[in-house]
Each structure stands twice: as structure tokens, then as C-alpha cells.
Amino acid sequence: MKLWFNLLCRDIEAQMRFYQALLGLPEAEASRSPIYRALETADFQFGFNAQAAYALLNLADRQPQDSTETPVVAYATLMLDTPEALDKAVAQVPALGGTVLKAPYATYYGQWQAVLCDPEGHVFRLSTLSLPGGA
């Protein structure tokens, strides 16, 4: 099984560039369309749907209004290889237009994790399966 996770976005190109710069993932060029961009690995595709996708998916009545903040009802957790890679990525988030909601911390289940927000307000986490030395 391969997971494809999509975000509904106002600016698909900017969102793709944010995550591409943050994670260093290649674009899934074969999936590119006027209303879709994606990043892809052998294990997953991370997609960005334009606003037109709400109607296409019969979700127009659930499309957030521009003046309202979208509630957090789900979030992706992207697993990185090392605590150092996580710290480096988190340090880039503000310069890329995102927000650090919770700086890297040791979870009670032994992961090194940060809670972040992309430029359009989607919440996501970066995590690793190990803790940095001394944490």
C-alpha cells in the first residue's frame, strides 16, 4: 500500500515549494496538473490541491471562507531520519513562511518532535524515532 495525502490549498505552487524546501523531496512531475502539484517518494505522495478541487470532489459546501481560520481536524506527521535533521528543518520554517507552534521536544513515547504550521495554516508535525543526545 502507498499513502497519498493531499492538502487543499489556496496556492498549490507556493505550498509545494514550502514543503519541497523543508523536506528536500522531488516533485511528482507525472502528477502535475492545472489544479494539482505533489512531492513523491517510493512510499508516499504528498499532494496539493487547488481550490477547484472542492467542487471536483463534491466538497464545495465544506470549503472554508477566506476570512475564517480553518480548524485543525487532522495533521500529517512526517518522520525524519535523525534529531539533527529535524532541528535543521525546524530552523528553516520561519524563513520559508511557516510557523513553529511547538519547538522540538522529547515526547513521552521517546520521539523528538516539533509542531509546525505551513504558510497557509495547515498544522503538521516533524518527528524522529530517536532522541538527541542529552534529551
Model-found features: residue ranges?
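Short, flexible, mixed-charge acidic loops at enzyme active sites
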Residues: A52-S67
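Core segments of cupin and vicinal oxygen chelate
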Residues: N6-A55
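Vicinal oxygen chelate
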Residues: V90-A135
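Residue-level marker for the onset of beta-strands and adjacent loop->beta junctions
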Residues: L3, S33-I35, A74, G110-W112
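Mid-chain, well-packed structural core segment of small domains
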Residues: T70-A91, G97-G98
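N-terminal beta-strand motif that seeds the catalytic metal site of vicinal oxygen chelate
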Residues: M1-R17, V73-L78, L129-A135
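Hydrophobic pocket/interface hotspot
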Residues: Q15, Y19, L86, V93
